[in-house]
Amino acid sequence: MKAIIVRPPNEGVEVKDITLRESTDGKIVVRTRLSGLCGTDRGLVTGRLTFARPPPGYDFLILGHETLGEVVKGNGEFSPGDLVVPVVRRGCGSCLNCMLGRQDFCETGRFTEIGIRGAHGTMREEFLEDPKYLVRVPRELGDEGVLLEPLSNVVKALTEMEYLQRRSWWRCDDSTYSCRTAVVLGSGPIGLLFSMALRSMGFRVIVANRRPPSQVESEITRDIGATFLNTSEHEDLEPDLIVDTSGHPSAVVPLLPRIRKNGAVILFGTTGLERYELTAEEITMLVENNILIFGSVNASKADFQAGVNLLVEWKARYPGVLQRMITKRVSVEEAPQVLKEKVPGEIKTVIDWTARES
């Protein structure tokens, strides 16, 4: 079958016909419909992500962790034709968090991640999967279901934020978040998904970038009731919550003195390409104002399931928005080029594995 592979730690990507040695015991056969592309995939292609590794016994790694698939051969839980999305991280099998299904909090670091670390991904025509790692997607969601994996990370981060902010009464006098302002740094797919989730929670949302919005970004932020702000022109923000999806300290640190008392900062984006100074005065401000700062990565199966409910809500509440987030579709043969460099105006590019069937 065709698959899109890399050979960590080397740079490069190729479409290749492969044969795998995989056990079928208890597994479900899933045909890949769409593969989403993200910065992690491109980091693997460039060789920048040094933690990438093939599965034992292989000298290559099949890419793919953002996936929408269709069950070909099921079991009692899943039937042929069901749309499914796989959970990315698989536990180490030894720490308590992993044994309790919270491999997103693995304490040993010996987890695997499909298409990233030690396990083949889903950028292939078909894959076998343990049903406990599959999440069913309603057929009415259709292709927008490919957004579930990135959304699961958003759900996890905001669930953590709500839990941690119980340290004080942070809701408004009507028990909602309607009096709170969230600034989301970055207007890529993760930034927009955070913005939609925060709007669903009742926050006033400002999507911030250091450039003007594209037409699609402008339309989406308008339609979800958020505001797009070019931070190179405006410096008067006073957020209660900052969500950084950019990974650039130079975007986050200057905002810290403006965050309101008892506020929170979620660090989600990573780049590893920039250094920025945090002064003693800024640290004092964080201490004196009870500012919470935490990082968040990956998600549990429960976060995926909660994400399904949000996608269903948004498809009805914001008609056309999820569809517009998928800004480009490419064939399998075109995939290497878009994996090497970002498409201009991209929010989410997907590889359509069904294109050859039409």
Swiss-Prot record:
Binding site for Zn(2+) 1: 38, 65-66, 149
Keywords annotated in UniProt: Carbohydrate metabolism, Metal-binding, NAD, NADP, Nucleotide-binding, Oxidoreductase, Zinc
Statement: the UniProt record of this protein carries the keyword Nucleotide-binding: yes
Gene Ontology biological-process annotations: non-phosphorylated glucose catabolic process; protein tetramerization
E.C. no: 1.1.1.47
Names of the cofactor(s): Zn(2+)
Gene Ontology MF terms: D-glucose binding; glucose 1-dehydrogenase (NAD+) activity; glucose 1-dehydrogenase (NADP+) activity; NAD+ binding; NADP+ binding; zinc ion binding
Positions of substrate binding: 40, 113, 149, 153, 298
Co-factor note (free text): Binds 2 Zn(2+) ions per subunit. One of the zinc atoms is essential for catalytic activity while the other has a structural function.
Keyword field contains S-adenosyl-L-methionine: no
Catalytic activity annotation: D-glucose + NAD(+) = D-glucono-1,5-lactone + NADH + H(+); D-glucose + NADP(+) = D-glucono-1,5-lactone + NADPH + H(+)
InterPro entries named in the record: ADH-like_N (IPR013154), Glc_1-DH_arc (IPR026583), Glu_dehyd_C (IPR031640), GroES-like_sf (IPR011032), NAD(P)-bd_dom_sf (IPR036291), Zn_alcohol_dh (IPR050129)
Role this protein plays: Catalyzes the NAD(P)(+)-dependent oxidation of D-glucose to D-gluconate via gluconolactone. Can utilize both NAD(+) and NADP(+) as electron acceptor. Is involved in the degradation of glucose through a non-phosphorylative variant of the Entner-Doudoroff pathway.
Family stated for the protein in its record: Belongs to the zinc-containing alcohol dehydrogenase family. Glucose 1-dehydrogenase subfamily.
Name under which the protein is recorded: Glucose 1-dehydrogenase
